[in-house]
């Protein structure tokens, strides 16, 4: 199967790439592969969303029945001791950590809605088809991907339901797999995209969705915490977002550069939920969903080159998360939009994909990540100094 553009991954960056491509040229044949059974099935819900990229991509999103409904109405930041908590005035927090213009959303629902917008423009979306292999031309340029064979038993034998994988060929292939995408890692190594860059850094994030008692629910509340149960030298903290329908998105992030070999991130999350400031909110509630994900935290200094012959990297496949904002959806979307502009220029002018670098450096995304470049490294001095920095 041949297309103008093949996109791997149905998250914010991949879907934004697809939408922008069709906006720029409705005649392009664009397909998007998603490994999950449906768009959003592998997205951990719960997100404080900055609409900057969406305002550019779909300026009329408010009229398109989007799932973006719950505005942030109130913020709290707590330093936790073992049993006590100290409330930090939110007006003392850096502007990048203030959320009064943002929304509490389900990221999975946002992706489902973006998929609807993409399909309405003519994008072909194939859920349930994980890309398993990168295909190359004789000159070494990426020419597409192959999906994995289906109907293989545990011993590698073909079952009656066997279906061979398919090759999807594109003039350009966009990799939008998310953090540590297995194909993206191969490309970074093969094309030395991280040459002269700082080593990438990672964290692990746990997220749960709770349905809590009405008396404990405050729709529009965003709360973050730092401190207990982690020590001052370990990077990490929590978030709690009060969404609609008495739901709370509760999560905990720990940097994987922690020094204590006995530390268990999962157990620290469980301890965190026993703190009186947290327990009083979720007590009597019901956990209805949970999961964990790797997070890419290296920031600006660790960003690999995002273009190579025949392909582009976008979103967390490259590492566009803004750590001080604790946000990556709007940056992932913008990186996908830049990829679409690059591809459009490439098809119009015949230049190679290196123009991505020029468009990226002229964008607000580059400026935002550049301004945030030293925040994560500052936490090597300890929690308090890192927050002050």
PLM feature spans:
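Predominantly flavin-linked oxidoreductase catalytic cores and closely associated redox partners
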Residues: 108, 117-278, 338, 342
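N-terminal Rossmann-like FAD-binding beta1-loop-alpha1 element of flavoenzymes
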Residues: 3-31
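FAD-binding beta-loop-beta segment adjacent to the flavin cofactor pocket
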Residues: 292-323
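Active-site-proximal substrate-binding core of FAD-dependent oxidoreductases
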Residues: 319-325, 341-384
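Glycine-rich phosphate/pyrophosphate-binding beta-alpha loops
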Residues: 104, 317-330
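A short alpha-helix-loop-beta-strand transition element characteristic
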Residues: 58-75, 128, 194-202, 353
């Amino acid at each position: 199967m041949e297309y103008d553009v093949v996109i791997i991954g149905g998250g914010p960056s991949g879907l934004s790439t697809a939408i922008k491509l069709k906006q720029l040229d409705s005649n392009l044949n664009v397909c998007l592969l998603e490994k999950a059974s449906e768009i959003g099935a592998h997205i951990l819900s719960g997100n404080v969303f900055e609409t900057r990229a969406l305002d550019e991509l779909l300026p009329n999103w408010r009229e398109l029945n989007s799932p973006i409904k719950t505005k942030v109405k109130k913020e709290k930041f707590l330093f936790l001791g073992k049993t006590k908590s100290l409330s930090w005035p939110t007006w003392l927090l850096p502007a990048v950590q203030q959320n009064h213009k943002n929304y509490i959303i389900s990221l999975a629902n946002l992706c489902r809605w973006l998929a609807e917008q993409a399909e309405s423009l003519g994008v072909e979306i194939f859920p349930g088809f994980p890309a398993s292999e990168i295909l190359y031309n004789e000159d070494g340029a990426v020419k597409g991907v192959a999906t994995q064979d289906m109907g293989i038993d545990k011993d590698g034998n073909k079952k009656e339901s066997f279906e061979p994988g398919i090759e999807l060929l594109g003039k350009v292939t966009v990799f939008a797999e998310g953090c540590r995408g297995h194909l993206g890692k191969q490309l970074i190594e093969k094309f030395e995209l991280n040459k002269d860059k700082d080593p990438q850094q990672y964290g692990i994030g746990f997220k749960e969705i709770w349905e809590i008692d009405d008396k404990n629910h405050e729709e529009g509340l965003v709360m973050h915490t730092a401190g207990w149960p982690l020590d001052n030298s370990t990077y990490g903290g929590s978030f709690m977002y009060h969404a609609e329908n008495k739901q709370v998105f509760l999560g905990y992030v720990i940097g994987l550069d922690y020094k204590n070999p006995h530390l268990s991130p999962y157990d620290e999350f469980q301890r965190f939920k026993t703190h009186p400031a947290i327990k009083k909110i979720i007590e009597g509630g019901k956990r209805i969903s949970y999961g964990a994900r790797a997070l890419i935290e290296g920031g600006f200094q660790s960003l690999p080159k995002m273009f190579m012959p025949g392909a582009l990297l976008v979103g967390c496949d490259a590492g566009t998360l803004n750590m001080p904002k604790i946000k990556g959806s709007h940056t992932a979307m913008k990186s996908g939009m830049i990829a679409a502009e690059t591809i459009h220029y490439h098809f119009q002018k015949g230049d190679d994909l290196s123009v991505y670098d020029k468009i990226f450096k002229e964008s607000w995304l580059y400026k935002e990540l550049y301004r945030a470049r030293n925040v994560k490294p500052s936490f090597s001095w300890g929690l308090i100094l890192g927050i002050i920095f």
